[in-house]
A protein has these predicted regions:
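Macromolecular interaction modules
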Residues: 1-120
């Protein structure tokens, strides 16, 4: 399993519409990627490690797929459309990281995440 992390660094005066990100942008990604996107999570930055607002990142999402190839083949054909939608929720830029998931606490964690917010 791989995890694609998309993180938006905090910047003074940065515009971020978290509602749009949650209700439009990520569902767009899910609808375009289809079954290869097993699930996703969205984080909203609140504070840094010392509790100071806003933290290093103002918004983050994590996409889970079985492999890099599955991610690239399902995301790639829609990359331009997805990138063009970014300006609808932020004027910031993102940092991307693809990682291999080495440990995931348990299936219970995944099940709980899926039950919190359906993505289909």
């Amino acid at each position: 399993m791989i995890k694609v992390s998309v993180m938006y660094p905090s910047k003074p005066g940065m515009r971020v519409d978290h509602d749009y990100y949650r209700t439009k942008h990520l569902p767009l990604i899910k609808s375009r990627m289809g079954a290869p996107l097993k699930y996703y999570t969205i984080d909203k930055g609140l504070a840094d490690g010392e509790g100071k607002p806003l933290g290093a990142y103002v918004a983050m999402c994590y996409l889970r797929c079985d492999s890099v190839d599955e991610y690239q083949s399902s995301f790639g054909p829609h990359a331009q459309e997805i990138r063009e939608d970014i300006s609808n929720f932020t004027d910031g830029t993102s940092i991307h990281q693809i990682s291999e998931v080495v440990v995931e606490n348990s299936a219970k964690v995944e099940t709980a995440a899926l039950q919190r917010s359906p993505i289909d």
